[in-house]
């Protein structure tokens, strides 16, 4: 009777010691994993934001180069001070289809770069956004062959203007049209710089999409 009364009064219930230790020892790895993930997240965001800033600066430089190339070529014209009754010696960019294509291609590239600036800023503000970054990657990749083709076609004409072709009896005209050749040569150089900047932009977007 005494033993049963003492058991009811105290209400002692045996608790297994091993289960309490295992339940208390489980949480620390979970806490450590959460701390590791939260530490990694700001680091990745910082890298992506830095790549976004580089992307924005490169686009500003590419805009300047593309518009400079299109403007220099589109305003190129030279007329020699001497002419005859039947002939007028004048060189104009639209006399050659390659130069016309050059102006159109670089103007399109410059317009696209201007329109892409808001999306580049969006990638800086929201570094983990994928849609805008993927869209920029696709259009930048399309712009690379467009600008490269225009610059290469114009470069071949500039080479003939400087050196001529004896097999085809094409004479070099840059001795007479010196100003014309200097302007178109500068435009071609600016266009190749634009193409190079587009290649770098594609690489930056690819790295930003790959970084996790």
Swiss-Prot record:
State the GO CC annotations: plasma membrane
**Where do the segments described as Disordered lie?**
1-28
Q: Which UniProt keywords are given for this protein, alphabetically ordered? A: Cell membrane, Cell wall biogenesis/degradation, Membrane, Transmembrane, Transmembrane helix
Q: Does the keyword Membrane apply?
A: yes
The answer to whether keyword Transmembrane applies is yes
Name its cellular compartments.
Cell membrane
Q: How does it sit in the membrane?
A: Multi-pass membrane protein
Q: Which residues cross the membrane?
A: 50-70, 101-121, 134-154, 187-207
Q: Where is the composition biased (Low complexity)?
A: 16-28
Which GO terms of type biological process are on file?
cell wall organization
Task: Please list the disulfide bridges.
Answer: none
Where are the Extracellular topological domains? 71-100, 155-186
Record topology, Cytoplasmic segments? 1-49, 122-133, 208-212
Note the coiled coil stretches, chain numbering.
none
Database matches in InterPro entries: CASP/CASPL, CASP_dom, CASPL
- Give the function comment from the record: Regulates membrane-cell wall junctions and localized cell wall deposition. Required for establishment of the Casparian strip membrane domain (CSD) and the subsequent formation of Casparian strips, a cell wall modification of the root endodermis that determines an apoplastic barrier between the intraorganismal apoplasm and the extraorganismal apoplasm and prevents lateral diffusion.
Instruction: Describe its partners and assembly state.
Output: Homodimer and heterodimers.
Family named by the database record: Belongs to the Casparian strip membrane proteins (CASP) family.
Name of the protein in its database record: Casparian strip membrane protein 1
Q: Which organism is it from?
A: Helianthus annuus
